[in-house]
Amino acid sequence: MKSTMTGIVERIPKPWGHEMIFARTNKYVGKILVIEKGHRLSLQLHRRKHESLMVLRGRLKLQLGKKTKTVGPGTAFTIAPKTIHRFEAPKGRVTLIEVSTPELWDVVRLQDDYGRRGK
């Protein structure tokens, strides 16, 4: 793989905010997630995808397995495959950075506020 500086970021609208993919290779993906106030992502798990994230701005309500806590900027966490999880921005916009394995298709939704099903 060669080094590049394209300046191209893929912005993907989501019902809860948006994602910006800044790196996509066969080994990893880098994203910025912006969750708007009062919104949350699906209660979900990944069969193969492994992700590490850090809160950049805002206060994130983080559910990992059966535990839920609120975390702020500078908090980093890792989500192993098969871990049930959810992110929520109850009091204001939240910005996260995520680096993961490349299986972006690997989403099993267990509950979704926006009516999305399955993958």
Q: Where do the model's predicted regions map?
A:
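Short hydrophobic/aromatic-rich beta-strand segments that constitute the beta-sheet cores
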Residues: 30, 42, 62-64, 98
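A short, N-terminal "cap"/entry segment at the start of jelly-roll beta-barrel domains
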Residues: 1-29, 42, 111-119
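Double-stranded beta-helix
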Residues: 7-13, 86-119
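Conserved short histidine dyad/triad with adjacent acidic residue
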Residues: 29-48
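Short acidic-glycine-tyrosine-enriched beta hairpin
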Residues: 65-84
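Glycine- and acidic-residue-biased ligand/ion/polar-headgroup-sensing regions
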Residues: 48-61, 65
